[in-house]
Amino acid sequence: MSVREDIKIMGASALMFRKGKYVTEKDLDIIIDIFTKMKFYSSGIDKEKLSKGESFSISFTNDHWRRRWDDDDYQWDSLDDNDHIIIYFYPNVEINYGEYIPSMGETVPDFLYFEDISGRGRLLLEFLHRYFKLFPEDVFMEEYFYTKDDIDKLYAKLPWNELWAYEDPKTF
């Protein structure tokens, strides 16, 4: 088993970066709207924390996940990971927690954290394709950095590779 396969089994997180601009409540609303248009429902939104500049998590689920969860014969391993995801939104980012982003030429803090992206390749690819149409300068990172161009190339290449987030975008 390769290291990448181990991560797929164990779980991995991913980050989103933005250069030079602080994220706002409007940015969060746009992110929620993207998931909503993908037929996901959000829970855990705490606008009071946002107004205080505190970070918080939001859980997104779709109808299929909800139906399985509410089923009397519910089995945890029967759920498709592409049916749910948790993100953490950081409205007041600090540069000392940043990453050097080559395409941006500087160290930039992350403002969005995707918890356990393992098995969520389709969900993330669809989300990022829509997201980068609105924020083309941002950068997504798991192990490698992905720009809008990288995601566009990957999105156009069918069938989608479920493990794309663990591969060097130069190989697309």
Where do the model's predicted regions map?
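Acidic, proline/glycine-rich low-complexity IDRs
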Residues: 2-18, 37, 41, 122-172
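Short, conserved charged micro-motifs
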Residues: 21-32, 122-124
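Short, intrinsically disordered low-complexity segments
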Residues: 37-114
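A mid-sequence interfacial segment
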Residues: 103-133
